[in-house]
């Protein structure tokens, strides 16, 4: 796993990431530059170059690696916000850009606050997997092609709003799960129990056994509903369902090993929260 070479003072990564995320989001001021006489593309290129030069001047590795990622996500959020308020058929893609950047940035920020011992550059989840990258690129390609050839398909506002609500619900549920689990939450399934590892059954974990997966499940499908992507909408639903089916089974094998009868009792009374997924089968 990629990570920080030296451990900084507690909370410094969170503050650094927040400051540089906001710095990237300051691209929202770009319309002011265009009014001052700069052309849109020229202004954008100069802005990006200026941001990168500033980060190179202020930070050295490994802090630069944190800063450049957070700043990039802030930049995407700012561009998405500008696009959201534009009078174009791409406005809903702006919603998507904001949702995507906030998801990845908040994964890092919450981990930095909640469980700094497990924090690394991988906490941004930007390099989650090849499959994740291919899925994202496919959704962008589908939106672009359909927006060119069937633009009316991208103007179903009520459907995009439904997708946005799914995204907000999924994001809030996942972050609530991360905060509730505290130091017990980790982006990687653990095969060895740490001394501080406890079974969390309160809060959102009293509703679902895997609330962070439930949140991510509805968030990912919601992004495609928001984009009015019929092909990726169906393929995302099937793919993430299969992924979380396998993931919950893998995780529950470890949890049963860690907590034994305590987890089995919890498993009996609380559902996974994922449709048609019951978790690992246990022969008693």
UniProtKB/Swiss-Prot annotation:
Activity modulation comment: Competitively inhibited by N-acetyl-S-trans,trans-farnesyl-l-cysteine (AFC).
EC number, UniProt record: 2.1.1.100
Topology with respect to the bilayer: Multi-pass membrane protein
Keyword Ribonucleoprotein: no
Residues binding substrate, per UniProt: 247
Keywords linked to the UniProt accession: Endoplasmic reticulum, Membrane, Methyltransferase, S-adenosyl-L-methionine, Transferase, Transmembrane, Transmembrane helix
Catalysis performed (reactions): [protein]-C-terminal S-[(2E,6E)-farnesyl]-L-cysteine + S-adenosyl-L-methionine = [protein]-C-terminal S-[(2E,6E)-farnesyl]-L-cysteine methyl ester + S-adenosyl-L-homocysteine
GO biological process annotation, one example: S-adenosylmethioninamine metabolic process
Annotated Gene Ontology cellular component terms: endoplasmic reticulum; endoplasmic reticulum membrane; membrane
Ranges of the Lumenal topological domain: 34-41, 88-92, 150-154, 229
Residues holding S-adenosyl-L-methionine: 190, 197-200, 205, 210-213, 251
Tissue expr: Ubiquitously expressed. Expressed at higher levels in the cerebellum and putamen than in other brain regions. Abundant expression seen in the Purkinje cells and pontine neurons.
Primary location group: endoplasmic reticulum
Cytoplasmic side: 1-16, 60-69, 113-131, 175-212, 245-284
InterPro entries: ICMT_MeTrfase, PPMT_MeTrfase
Single GO MF annotation: protein C-terminal S-isoprenylcysteine carboxyl O-methyltransferase activity
Compartment annotation: Endoplasmic reticulum membrane
Lineage: superkingdom: Eukaryota
TM annotation in the entry: 17-33, 42-59, 70-87, 93-112, 132-149, 155-174, 213-228, 230-244
Family membership noted in the UniProt record: Belongs to the class VI-like SAM-binding methyltransferase superfamily. Isoprenylcysteine carboxyl methyltransferase family.
The protein's role, per its UniProt record: Catalyzes the post-translational methylation of isoprenylated C-terminal cysteine residues.
Protein name: Protein-S-isoprenylcysteine O-methyltransferase
Organism of derivation: Homo sapiens
């Amino acid at each position: 796993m990629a990570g920080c070479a030296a451990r900084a003072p507690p909370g410094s990564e969170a503050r650094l990431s927040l400051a540089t995320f906001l710095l990237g989001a300051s691209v929202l001021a770009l319309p002011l530059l265009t009014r001052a006489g700069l052309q849109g593309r020229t202004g954008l290129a100069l802005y990006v170059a200026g941001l990168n030069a500033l980060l190179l001047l202020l930070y050295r590795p490994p802090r630069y690696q944190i800063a450049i990622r957070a700043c990039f996500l802030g930049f995407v959020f700012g561009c998405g916000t500008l696009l959201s308020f534009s009078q174009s058929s791409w406005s809903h893609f702006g919603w998507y850009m904001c949702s995507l950047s906030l998801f990845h940035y908040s994964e890092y920020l919450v981990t930095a606050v909640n469980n700094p011992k497990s924090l690394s550059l991988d906490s941004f989840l930007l390099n989650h997997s090849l499959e994740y990258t291919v899925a994202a690129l496919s959704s962008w390609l589908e939106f672009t092609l359909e927006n060119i050839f069937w633009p009316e398909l991208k103007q179903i506002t009520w459907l995009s709003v439904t997708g946005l609500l799914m995204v907000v619900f999924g994001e809030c549920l996942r972050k609530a799960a991360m905060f509730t689990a505290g130091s017990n939450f980790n982006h990687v399934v653990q095969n060895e129990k740490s001394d501080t590892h406890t079974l969390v059954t309160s809060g959102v974990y009293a509703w679902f056994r895997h609330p962070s997966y439930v949140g991510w499940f509805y968030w990912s499908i919601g992004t495609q509903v928001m984009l009015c992507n019929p092909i990726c909408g169906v393929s995302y639903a099937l793919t993430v369902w299969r992924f979380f089916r396998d993931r919950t089974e893998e995780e529950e094998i470890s949890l049963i090993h860690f907590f034994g009868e305590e987890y089995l009792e919890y498993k009996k009374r609380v559902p996974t929260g994922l449709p048609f997924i019951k978790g690992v089968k246990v022969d008693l």
